[in-house]
């Protein structure tokens, strides 16, 4: 796919976006100061709710926060009424290039320019739902097309969250998410980049770095299966191979995230020192201990499991998926008790973009307090994305990424599913 094709796709999309939804237009931050006022403001670091709350914004940054702030001459005052202001939300596990439906068919039937348009619309939907920063965990066959989407957002040409991108995930031949079951004589586009050895891993990582990847995503385990009446998951890369990947990523100034469930794959990932283990269930006590010791983030992704359970093809499959969800919930409580660091990621894409705030509700349902979930999302999420001290808190010097919800999310976390105001970088996208 050429750069020219991607640019044509993005320009065409930008026209559609601006006509269809003027509130979603990308724009530069205004030159005049803005004062945001609301009944409540959440200090995520302390858990304290400031009543009332005000934020002074100049350009794309926060200047002052408190019960009252300066109102410089020429300021625009936005009164958000009986709402709570908090930092823009973070989703640490998304797929902009996916939509509901069979993933293999999307790769086979949809061109990369078409999927890039889909991704840009998804980015807008996520932003309008209050997600001002996200980590895209693989284009699933669209290569480095996410680079163009990220750059267009950064340049203010299209609306969307701040993005950390990975390009395609890295996979072994015949591994998880590979296009299996097709005529072997028919060329089918792979959903990931293949690497079967440590040397091949390093070569693929260098190519992805060249193409603009912010981090590396590796499939460390395959699909769950039942063996001897128990859930089991095969690993794909050895500890030595993952260590080589983590070492090379560090040399490139990047970090490694792994898709991993079960043993020994999750243990290999923890021993290698990856940045996050996504999905993160069926963990041994040793893996849990290492994750706490090395501060490796667990990203549970409950919402995708719930979605698959609720939309299973047969009642039997639905029952199995719901059983797996309960297993995940038990594992989650064990990880919370062990103080494993958590981040919030939904795996949105296979279910509709803009609906992923359901993840907050499920994490509370399965054992965390609303404040703990918000701290995991905003403080840990900012750290995982490499933007700590830039996003994730409402403090002077941070980017002016602010959302507002009705009521108090510490009392009713489901209010995060009803974001009514969105500012990113000093630009109001929704009010």
What is the predicted role of each segment?
Residues 105-117, 185-202:
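Active-site mouth loops of central-metabolism enzymes
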Residues 6-21:
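Bacterial N-terminal signal peptides
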Residues 101-103, 146, 175, 226-229, ...:
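Histidine/acidic-residue-rich catalytic or RNA/ligand-binding cores of hydrolases
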Residues 148, 198-298, 322-341, 389:
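Histidine/acidic residue-rich metal-binding segments in metalloenzymes
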Residues 119-145, 159-169, 213-224, 255, ...:
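Divalent metal-dependent hydrolysis catalytic cores, especially in the metallo-beta-lactamase
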Residues 80-157, 173, 240, 272:
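Metal-associated gating/positioning segment near the N- to mid-region
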Residues 30-32, 41, 46-86:
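Histidine-rich, glycine-flanked metal-binding segment
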Residues 251, 255, 324-409:
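His/Asp/Glu-enriched, well-ordered alpha-helical/loop segment
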């Amino acid at each position: 796919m050429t750069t020219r094709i991607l640019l044509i796709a993005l320009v065409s999309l930008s026209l559609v976006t601006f006509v269809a939804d003027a509130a979603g237009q990308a724009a530069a931050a205004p030159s005049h100061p803005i004062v945001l006022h609301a009944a409540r403001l959440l200090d995520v670091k302390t858990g304290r709710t400031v009543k009332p709350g005000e934020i002074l914004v100049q350009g794309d940054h926060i200047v002052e926060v408190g019960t009252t702030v300066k109102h410089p001459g020429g300021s625009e005052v936005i009164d958000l009424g009986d709402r709570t202001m908090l930092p823009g939300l973070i989703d640490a596990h998304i797929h902009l290039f996916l939509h509901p439906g069979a993933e293999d068919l999307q790769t086979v039937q949809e061109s990369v320019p078409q999927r890039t348009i889909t991704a840009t619309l998804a980015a807008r939907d996520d932003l309008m739902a209050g997600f001002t920063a996200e980590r895209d965990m693989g284009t699933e066959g669209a290569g480095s097309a996410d680079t163009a989407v990220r750059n267009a957002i950064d340049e203010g040409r299209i609306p969307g969250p701040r993005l950390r991108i990975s390009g395609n995930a890295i996979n072994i031949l015949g591994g998880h998410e590979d296009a299996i079951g097709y005529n072997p004589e028919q060329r089918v586009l792979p959903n990931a980049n293949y690497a079967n050895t440590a040397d091949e891993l390093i070569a693929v990582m260098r190519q992805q770095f060249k193409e603009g990847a912010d981090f590396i995503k590796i499939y460390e385990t395959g699909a769950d299966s039942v063996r001897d009446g128990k859930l089991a998951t095969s690993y794909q890369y050895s500890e030595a191979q993952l260590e080589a990947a983590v070492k090379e990523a560090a040399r490139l100034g990047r970090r490694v995230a792994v898709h991993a469930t079960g043993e020994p794959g999750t243990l290999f990932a923890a021993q290698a020192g990856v940045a996050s283990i996504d999905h993160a269930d069926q963990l041994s006590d040793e893996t849990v201990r290492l994750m706490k010791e090395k501060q490796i983030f667990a990203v549970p992704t409950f919402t995708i499991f719930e979605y698959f359970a609720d939309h299973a093809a047969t009642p039997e499959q639905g029952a199995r998926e719901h059983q797996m969800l309960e297993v995940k919930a038990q594992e989650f409580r064990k990880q919370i008790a062990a103080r494993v660091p958590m981040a919030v990621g939904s795996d949105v894409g296979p279910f509709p973009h803009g609906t992923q705030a359901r993840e907050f509700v499920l994490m509370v349902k399965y054992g965390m307090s609303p404040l703990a979930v918000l701290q995991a999302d905003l403080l840990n999420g900012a750290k995982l994305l490499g933007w700590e001290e830039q996003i994730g808190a409402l403090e002077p010097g941070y980017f002016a990424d602010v959302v507002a919800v009705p009521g108090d999310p510490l009392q009713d976390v489901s209010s995060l599913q009803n974001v009514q105001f969105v500012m990113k970088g000093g630009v109001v996208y929704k009010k």
